[in-house]
Amino acid sequence: MAKNEIIQKAEEKMQKAQNVLERDLGSIRAGRANASLLDKVSVDYYGAPTPLNQMASITIPEPRVLLVTPYDKSVLNDIEQAILMSDLGINPANDGSAIRLVVPQLTEETRKDLAKNVKAEGEKAKVAVRNIRRDAMDTLKKANKNGDYNDDEFHDLEKQTQDSTDKAIKVVDEIVANKEKEVLEG
């Protein structure tokens, strides 16, 4: 395995952990309408769970309103049920051709709870990044034992791995801080 290949793979995995964090935080509502709130909603469509965003257009006509317009009107009631069954805490209003979702204002207590959830998701991402670093370090140590690197090269690679980890953790912290700010300010 080439020297940089280990670090490159670790950096790619760290980037994926950051992307997962951003996706997961996108589904946490912050008092404003955001189409990503519905990303985790699946509708039973002819016996198969289908993501809502593949069955309907989701628009934001007003700052706190989501409008879900199904491509096939026959599934309107199924979509309404799926939204009710999700843990969004938003009641859908079915007008016969589309579903309106009014995102309620968040109470101070709810905002604090959501901020805790944001921190917890951030911590999970940091743990994932640290596990990736540990795996990369283990691979480097094995390669060093096999004589693939001299001690100077090994220490340089260890430092590069730690630098990559520090950068990834910093990005995770920034993502979490931005989402916390969004949630707390609403």
Swiss-Prot record:
Know the name of this protein? Ribosome-recycling factor
- Disulfide bond sites: none
Question: A GO molecular-function term, please?
Answer: ribosomal large subunit binding
Looking at the Swiss-Prot or TrEMBL record, what is one Pfam family this protein matches? Answer: RRF
Instruction: Give the classification, highest ranks.
Output: Bacteria, Bacillati, Bacillota, Bacilli, Lactobacillales
Gene Ontology BP annotations: translational termination
Does the entry feature the keyword Protein biosynthesis, yes or no? yes
Biological source species:
Pediococcus pentosaceus (strain ATCC 25745 / CCUG 21536 / LMG 10740 / 183-1w)
Function description: Responsible for the release of ribosomes from messenger RNA at the termination of protein biosynthesis. May increase the efficiency of translation by recycling ribosomes from one round of translation to another.
CDD domains assigned: RRF
